[in-house]
Structures are given as C-alpha cells and as structure tokens.
Design a protein with these regions (language model features):
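Active-site-adjacent beta-strand/loop module that shapes the phosphate/pyrophosphate-binding cleft
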Residues: 92-129, 141, 163, 170
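N-terminal strand-loop-strand
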Residues: 11-56, 104
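Alpha-helical and coiled-coil interaction segments, frequently adjacent to or embedded
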Residues: 2-6
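Alpha-helix-centered segments that form part of catalytic cores
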Residues: 130-149
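The catalytic Nudix box helix
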Residues: 56-90, 144
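Short, P/G- and charge-enriched loop/turn segments at secondary-structure junctions
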Residues: 9-15, 126-131
Length: 172
C-alpha cells in the first residue's frame, strides 16, 4: 500500500494522501540592521503563545506546483502581499512534526499593518457545535535576528542561520 500511495498519491481506498511538504518566504530588510518578517498563527490555540510561536509565512504545496510558486502563493494568501525581488534559496528542513519545509528569502520592506490573511474554519469551543473563522496569521512583525530566534518556531530557527550565511557569502 505504501508503494501504491507513492506512485498514485492515493491510498487503496482512493483517499488522497496528505502531502507533508510546505513552502514559504522569509522577507528580510536592512534598517540598518538585518530584520526578518515573521507571522503569528491565528486561532485559539496560538492566542496566548508568543516566544517560539511565530513562523515564516508558508503553506502546503499543491499538485502541479513547484516549491517556489507555492511559497509565493502562500505568502500572498497569508499576508495579502506579493513581495518583489529575487528569491534567495534557503533550502529545505524537516520540522519536528515531520513536515518538510522549503524556504526562500526575499529582500522587501512591506508594512505588516497592511496584513490581510486568509481564514480557516474550526469548531470552537471544542464540542460546542459552533463553527468559527480565524485568520491563518493574526499579525506579522519585523524582528531583529536576536529576537527572531526567540520568537520563531524551534523547527524553523535554522532558516535564520541560513539567511545570515547566504547574505554573508560573496555573490556567485
């Protein structure tokens, strides 16, 4: 069954296999020190979480989509903004939950006050029968690298190191 699922993308009972891959963009600016833009997840689970809760705006890669296309689409869906500039590849990493994340960095100076996030629905409170909508990202903010290392999800912290390394390497 595993081989069948890998080839067809479906389990034997025709259920689609959940893809465990996502892609995202890490915006950065130099004002004059290096800062990165992180998003805080929306919804009741994340409401009171701060340190270790912020994320690179990212999401699932759709069928037929390459990783960079997915990263750009997801950034727009979660922020309402299309960043300009060239994408610097940061590679991929595997988060503690097993999801593989592909990431790029783009230099841009977007105003997070203009955040317009897409929404998701969930039953809240649990077992209440009430379906409520929440933003995927409830706020976005620029952080210097030292503070960003405290704010970002532990499984994504390596992306900050990769960005620093990419920016300090001579151009090819």
């Amino acid at each position: 069954m595993i081989a069948y699922a890998r080839i067809t993308g479906q389990a034997l009972d025709n259920r689609p296999i959940k893809r465990n891959r996502s892609a995202g963009l890490l915006l950065f600016r130099r004002k004059p020190r290096l800062e990165v833009l992180l998003g805080h997840p929306g919804g009741p689970f994340w409401r009171r979480k701060d340190d270790g809760a912020w994320s690179v705006p990212k999401g699932e890669i759709e069928d037929g989509e390459n990783e960079l296309m997915a990263a750009r689409r997801e950034f727009f869906e979660e922020t309402g903004y299309h960043p300009t500039g060239s994408a610097i590849p940061l590679g991929s990493l595997r988060q503690p939950g097993g999801k593989q994340v592909f990431a790029w960095a783009i230099e841009d100076d977007w105003d997070p006050e203009k955040l317009i996030s897409n929404m998701f629905s969930m039953e809240w409170p649990p077992k209440s029968g009430r379906i409520q909508q929440f933003p995927e990202i409830d706020r976005a903010q620029w952080f210097g690298l030292e503070l960003a290392r405290k704010k970002i999800l532990k499984g994504q912290a390596e992306l900050l190191d990769r960005l620093e390394q990419a920016l300090s390497s001579p151009p090819r």
